[in-house]
């Protein structure tokens, strides 16, 4: 499929541009200390990075500290939101680059959707203890979700009003664009999607979120992926087959699909999951969250990530953090959208605003090349009423 290849190519190209420039969030008052610290960290790690990369797992390198299943109780979840944060920008070894920068942005008052970071120590423990977690983690995650609920005013798994939906993303110390996994719109099931539809009075939006969630979760967490005998990704094949049958055009733009189309595709997705896994798609939001966290930690040791770390001398024992964050939506209609932005041109370093966006889309659409993205300079023209 040309479209699928274009998406993958676009993701790689866009991800490479966005590898590092996006996370400069410290204030002018802190600039000098941050620079000194960054220099110190680079000097301290230069020798380690210069050495040949040893093919070891996190468990081997840190086994003496985390090999016991009765590890010492500690703090594993660091929250942020509403102008407060448990962490800060200097904590990248523990919180990963994304988590540390989100915490710093919250601390300086930027409008960051609330969330929490599960630290890299949990990743170390995960690999040292047969993919299990510290006993304290579940309670700390529940406290983190409760904090997001309080700030956003929605409840996780609520089937009576607007439900809290969350995004689960990786966050290594050094940026590894496109190498690990992301799940969006987590928390949807057959009941909460109806609540979302009623609360927003936007059926297409609600069912589009559910379709996206099943597709991402099925791929990343449940392993419903292309078999050696198949030419295309199975979920994409389902979508294109439906478009051909219902509309006579397998390459119809996704935004042209209505709520009834999306409902039909979702039923086919569920059948695909049952056929490939032998189990129904999980409906319990907490089960969904636990599966997503495990999948992100698992993606630290996938083939893509291993090859990338070898190329850029990133030690395996660093591990990745996991960021759990309240969803904001760019797919509610033509007055919403998603994009990426930089305070400098990522290709040249020139001090000019640079970005690209798509209307009526979620973030993965921009990096995957689902539709041609538009330059950031066009935002004012297309959305003149935006602040």
Segments and roles (model prediction):
Residues 2-20, 24, 28, 40, ...:
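N-terminal beta-alpha lobe that positions the nucleotide/phosphoryl donor
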């Amino acid at each position: 499929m040309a479209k699928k290849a274009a998406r993958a190519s676009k993701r790689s190209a866009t991800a490479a541009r966005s590898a590092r420039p996006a996370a400069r969030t410290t204030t002018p008052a802190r600039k000098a200390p941050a620079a000194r610290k960054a220099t110190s960290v680079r000097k301290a790690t230069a020798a380690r990075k210069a050495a040949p990369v040893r093919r070891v797992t996190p468990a081997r390198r840190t086994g003496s500290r985390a090999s016991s299943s009765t590890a010492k109780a500690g703090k594993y979840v660091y929250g942020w939101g509403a102008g407060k944060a448990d962490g800060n920008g200097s904590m990248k070894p523990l919180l990963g680059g994304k988590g540390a920068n989100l915490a710093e942005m919250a601390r300086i008052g930027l409008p960051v959707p609330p969330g929490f970071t599960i630290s890299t120590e949990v990743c170390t423990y995960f690999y040292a203890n047969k993919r299990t977690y510290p006993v304290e983690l579940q309670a700390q995650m529940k406290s983190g979700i409760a904090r997001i609920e309080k700030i956003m005013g929605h409840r996780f798994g609520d089937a009576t009003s607007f439900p809290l939906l969350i995004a689960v993303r990786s966050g290594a110390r050094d940026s590894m664009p496109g190498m690990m996994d992301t799940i969006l719109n987590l928390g949807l099931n057959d009941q909460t999607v109806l609540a979302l539809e009623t609360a927003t009075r936007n059926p297409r939006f609600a069912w589009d979120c559910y379709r996206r969630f099943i597709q991402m979760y099925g791929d990343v967490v449940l392993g419903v992926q292309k078999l050696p005998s198949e030419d295309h990704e199975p979920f994409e094949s389902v979508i294109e087959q439906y478009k051909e049958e219902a509309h006579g055009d397998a390459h119809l733009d996704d935004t042209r699909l209505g709520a009834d189309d999306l409902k039909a595709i979702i039923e086919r997705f569920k059948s695909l999951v049952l056929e490939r896994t032998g189990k129904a798609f999980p409906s319990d939001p907490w089960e969904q969250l636990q599966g997503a966290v495990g999948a992100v930690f698992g993606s630290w040791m996938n083939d893509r990530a291993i090859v990338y770390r070898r190329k850029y001398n990133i030690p395996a024992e660093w591990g990745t953090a996991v960021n759990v964050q309240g969803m904001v939506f760019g797919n509610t209609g033509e007055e919403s959208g998603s994009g990426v932005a930089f305070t400098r041109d990522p290709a040249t370093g020139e001090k000019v605003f640079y970005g690209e966006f798509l209307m009526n889309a979620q973030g993965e659409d921009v990096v995957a090349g689902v539709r041609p993205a538009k330059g950031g300079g066009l935002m004012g023209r297309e959305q003149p009423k935006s602040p």
